[in-house]
């Protein structure tokens, strides 16, 4: 309503969040209607892809321009990437209940196990989750946005680096973004290994302080 009232274009970057929530996105979860949306990541099925969704009223205004607007990129219009993305979305949508129930269940298990450990050992960290997306936050405080998270974590760069290094030494790649995604193929054996090593890493950084 604010954007509409002030004649502003609302743009959503859903590169990470696109179709991750029961085959829907953040805008669907909160009933928001951006004018422009961007998607990518898993939609390519392992291949690089970027998708832009633009509302018809925006496209019509662009079309009124006498000069043609050029959209280009290394993988623009790549038939293989587009074919795979199309098939992948169709498959996921058709099987979304089984897929997302599986992902949510595994993600919830990780969050519960890690938070129980952190609370029991009085460690200043927290495992947060939105559907199947997980993030280890290195503060107990109830953060409400990225700026707050970065404020606290910037004070613990060395600790986070040690945590990441320990996981890497135990054959677990912990991304620099800190966001953890679970796949349907991820087994509980792998999940328990991640939890076990994460607990050891947390204990290690706590004792080193």
Task: Outline where the language-model segments fall.
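Conserved N-terminal phosphate-binding loop of PLP-dependent enzymes in the Aspartate aminotransferase
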Residues: 1-209
């Amino acid at each position: 309503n604010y954007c509409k009232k002030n004649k502003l274009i609302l743009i959503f970057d859903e590169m990470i969040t696109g179709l991750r929530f029961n085959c829907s996105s953040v805008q669907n979860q909160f009933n928001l209607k951006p004018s422009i949306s961007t998607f990518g990541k898993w939609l390519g099925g392992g291949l690089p892809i970027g998708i832009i969704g633009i509302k018809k009223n925006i496209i019509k205004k662009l079309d009124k321009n006498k000069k043609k607007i050029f959209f280009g990129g290394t993988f623009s219009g790549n038939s293989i990437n587009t074919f795979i993305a199309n098939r992948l979305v169709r498959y996921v949508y058709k099987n979304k209940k089984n897929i997302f129930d599986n992902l949510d269940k595994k993600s919830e298990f990780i969050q519960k196990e890690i938070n129980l450990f952190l609370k029991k050992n009085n460690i200043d960290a927290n495992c947060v989750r939105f559907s199947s997306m997980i993030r280890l936050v290195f503060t107990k405080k109830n953060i409400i946005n990225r700026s707050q998270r970065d404020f606290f974590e910037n004070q613990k760069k060395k600790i986070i680096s040690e945590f990441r290094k320990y996981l890497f030494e135990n054959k677990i790649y912990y991304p620099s973004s800190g966001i953890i995604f679970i796949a349907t193929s991820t087994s509980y054996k792998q999940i328990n290994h991640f939890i076990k090593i994460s607990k050891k890493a947390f204990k290690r950084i706590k004792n080193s302080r």
